[in-house]
């Protein structure tokens, strides 16, 4: 027993060394790192112009796939209708929602003109967190944007975005609910 204890402690130490850094990343640090991957895409001269739209959006989508949990976003959007969908319908809806978000965000991102992002706070509650930011325009106008994130393994993934306090997924949920109820 005494001979096993040092080995167990050594193993525990190794696990902490290799696992702790993944868990040590805060939601804000992870989101900031991901956003910092998108900004160079928008500034890249070889991706500018209408002829490069498809290529530019594919690069943005690749980063979005690292940041977003489209399945959780889809579940939120469908609300009570989610449980009545088959796995195949859920996967298809999540994919289509990802496409919708890509088009909506990509169009706005392509209008990027040197705005700054200020990270103003973070609230973590277990596996859920809110990352508070402000987008600051060149004119000094501040637009509050909060990201609702959840932990999946060692990553924090966005599942909702609140712009000036209004939930994007809540907005889609109201629209989809109306469509589903009338069809």
Give the residues covered by each predicted segment.
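Bacterial N-terminal signal peptides that target proteins for export
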Residues: 1-10
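Cleavable N-terminal signal peptides
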Residues: 11-12, 22
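Sec/Tat signal peptide C-region and signal peptidase I cleavage site
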Residues: 18-24
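Early exported N-terminus immediately downstream of N-terminal targeting peptides
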Residues: 26-105
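Surface-exposed, polar/charged faces of alpha-helical domains
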Residues: 44-51, 55, 84-91, 111-114, ...
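Surface-exposed, charged secondary-structure patches
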Residues: 103-143
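Short beta-strand edge/turn micro-motifs at domain boundaries
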Residues: 142-170
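Non-transmembrane domains of secretory- and envelope-associated proteins
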Residues: 167, 171-183
